[in-house]
Amino acid sequence: MQQEALGMVETKGLTAAIEAADAMVKSANVMLVGYEKIGSGLVTVIVRGDVGAVKAATDAGAAAARNVGEVKAVHVIPRPHTDVEKILPKGIS
């Protein structure tokens, strides 16, 4: 795993997740690396980039998602340990 920050926005429903993803990549220099359907309608969108950009992106994504649905969680990991890659959904690491 690169030493880039990892940002996550978890929403209730796919529409809010797509809205969050769109806002995140438009608002900051981040790379959309994937999403994960958790179950019970929960979807987590994951981005990577430098810490400041990821923080700005997750803030924008959460705000956009709240306009069309429900945000369950927002989190930024500034420098994830390399072992975190083992628990990320396939295709995201």
Curated annotation (Swiss-Prot):
GO CC terms of this entry: bacterial microcompartment
Biological pathway: Polyol metabolism; 1,2-propanediol degradation
Gene Ontology biological-process annotations: propanediol catabolic process
UniProt main location, coarse: other
Keywords: Bacterial microcompartment, Transport
Effect of residue 26 to A: Forms sheets but not nanotubes upon overexpression of PduA*
Application notes: Artificial BMCs can be made in E.coli by expressing pduA-pduB/B'-pduJ-pduK-pduN-pduU-pduT (in this order); pduT and pduU are optional, while pduA, pduB/B', pduJ, pduK and pduN are essential. A construct with the reversed gene order does not make BMCs. Ethanogenic BMCs can be made in E.coli by targeting pyruvate decarboxylase (pdc) and alcohol dehydrogenase (adh) to them. PduP(1-18)-Pdc and PduD(1-18)-Adh strains targeted to the BMC (PduA, PduB, PduJ, PduK, PduN, PduU) make significantly more ethanol than strains where Pdc and Adh are not targeted to the BMC. Can be used to make a synthetic intracellular scaffold that fills the E.coli cytoplasm by adding a heterodimeric coiled-coil system (CC-Di-AB). PduA* is N-terminally tagged with CC-Di-B which makes the scaffold, while other proteins can be targeted to the scaffold using a CC-Di-A tag. A strain that produces increased amounts of ethanol (using pdc and adh) has been made as proof of concept. The scaffolds can also be targeted to the cell inner membrane. The same CC-Di-B construct also targets proteins to the BMC, probably on the exterior face.
Compartments where found: Bacterial microcompartment
Loss of function: phenotype: When the whole pdu operon except this gene is expressed in E.coli no BMCs are made; with the whole operon many BMCs are produced in E.coli. This gene is not essential for BMC formation; a pduB/B'-pduJ-pduK-pduN-pduU-pduT strain produces BMCs in E.coli.
Domain BMC per the UniProt entry, residue ranges: 5-89
PROSITE patterns: BMC_1, BMC_2
InterPro entries membership: Bact_microcomp_CS (IPR020808), BMC_dom (IPR000249), BMC_shell (IPR050575), CcmK-like_sf (IPR037233), CcmK/CsoS1_BMC (IPR044872)
Assembly mode: Homohexamer with a central pore; Lys-26 and Arg-79 interactions are very important for hexamer symmetry. The hexamers pack against each other in arrays. Interacts individually with shell proteins PduB, PduB', PduJ, PduK, PduN and PduU. Modeling suggests PduC, PduD, PduE, PduL and PduP interact with a cleft formed by the C-terminal segments of 2 adjacent PduA subunits (on the BMC luminal side) in the hexamer.
Function: One of the major shell proteins of the bacterial microcompartment (BMC) dedicated to 1,2-propanediol (1,2-PD) degradation, probably important for metabolite diffusion into and out of the BMC. Overexpression of a C-terminally mutated form (PduA*) makes thin parallel filaments with a honeycomb-like assembly in cross-section that probably form nanotubes. The filaments interfere with septation. PduA is probably the hub for binding multiple enzymes to the interior of the BMC. At least one of PduA or PduJ is required for BMC assembly; it must be encoded as the first gene in the pdu operon. Expression of a cosmid containing the full 21-gene pdu operon in E.coli allows E.coli to grow on 1,2-PD with the appearance of BMCs in its cytoplasm. Overexpression of this protein leads to aberrant intracellular filaments.
PANTHER family: BACTERIAL MICROCOMPARTMENT SHELL PROTEIN PDUJ, PROPANEDIOL UTILIZATION PROTEIN PDUA
Similarity comment text for this entry: Belongs to the bacterial microcompartments protein family.
Protein name stated in the entry: Bacterial microcompartment shell protein PduA
Organism name: Citrobacter freundii
Gene: pduA
